[in-house]
Amino acid sequence: MKLIFLSGVKRSGKDTTADFIMSNYSAVKYQLAGPIKDALAYAWGVFAANTDYPCLTRKEFEGIDYDRETNLNLTKLEVITIMEQAFCYLNGKSPIKGVFVFDDEGKESVNFVAFNKITDVINNIEDQWSVRRLMQALGTDLIVNNFDRMYWVKLFALDYLDKFNSGYDYYIVPDTRQDHEMDAARAMGATVIHVVRPGQKSNDTHITEAGLPIRDGDLVITNDGSLEELFSKIKNTLKVL
């Protein structure tokens, strides 16, 4: 099973490339942002159950029939509450270093130092709170920058190893947004493919939307024509793997 990591800014054709491979080859897909969406969908469900906020399911966090840039009009205190719940969800999947303590009855809670760190990070963010901004805050501003830089890579590695002998020809990771994630992928023997649309730049200033550098050994698909031309380039690229 060949491991492929895709990279590209918004609207570069990266997701179209992943979908084409999934539809036309024996392939399985893993999203690094999948656990982020899972955790926030769970946390939102707990939070919104006692408020007048709208119901947002996993589908909305995936962006299906929903604009993830929509302002949710959350206060910072409400965001902190959501993040606490998201941390609890994630810790149940794979422990987050230095976050949780247990009381005499065995009940789990966020420790004082970790809570202060979460609070400080959220209080220093002045952006409007949308689904996308919640994802960036949990995935990068909190977990990667303050608790465990390799946390999302570890979750990917567990899934990859579980599927290693599953019979698929390709294992696709379509949403790599940080250099350390891509470095880990290269170390694991992944083929890195950058999908580039000339002149396409992201207006999102968050680090996860800045695009990644092309390293020696990486492959590049230039998406500068029709869909049919893009599909032809994908086929030709996969032939050389």
UniProtKB/Swiss-Prot annotation:
Binding annotation for ATP: 11, 13, 15-16
Alphabetized InterPro entries for the sequence: DNMK, DNMP_kinase_N, P-loop_NTPase
Molecular function GO labels: ATP binding; deoxynucleoside-phosphate kinase activity, ATP as phosphate donor; dGMP kinase activity; dTMP kinase activity
Cofactor(s) in the UniProt record: Mg(2+)
Annotated binding of dGMP, by residue: 10, 36-37, 68, 132, 139-140, 144, 152, 175, 177-178, 181, 208
UniProt function note: Allows the synthesis of deoxyribonucleoside triphosphates necessary for the rapid viral DNA replication. Phosphorylates dGMP, dTMP and 5-hydroxymethyl-dCMP (hmdCMP) while excluding dCMP and dAMP. The phosphorylation of 5-hydroxymethyl-dCMP represents the first step in the replacement of cytosine by hydroxymethylcytosine in new viral DNA genomes.
Residues that coordinate or bind Mg(2+): 42, 85, 108
Tree of life domain: Viruses
Protein name, per record: Deoxynucleotide monophosphate kinase
Record note on quaternary structure: Homodimer.
Activity regulation information from UniProt: Inhibited by pyridoxal 5'-phosphate and diethylpyrocarbonate.
Keywords carried by this UniProt record: ATP-binding, DNA replication, Kinase, Magnesium, Metal-binding, Nucleotide-binding, Transferase, Viral DNA replication
Family matches, as Pfam families: DNMK (PF21448)
Gene designation: 1
EC number: 2.7.4.-
Family: Belongs to the dNMP kinase family.
Catalytic activity: dTMP + ATP = dTDP + ADP; dGMP + ATP = dGDP + ADP; 5-hydroxymethyl-dCMP + ATP = 5-hydroxymethyl-dCDP + ADP
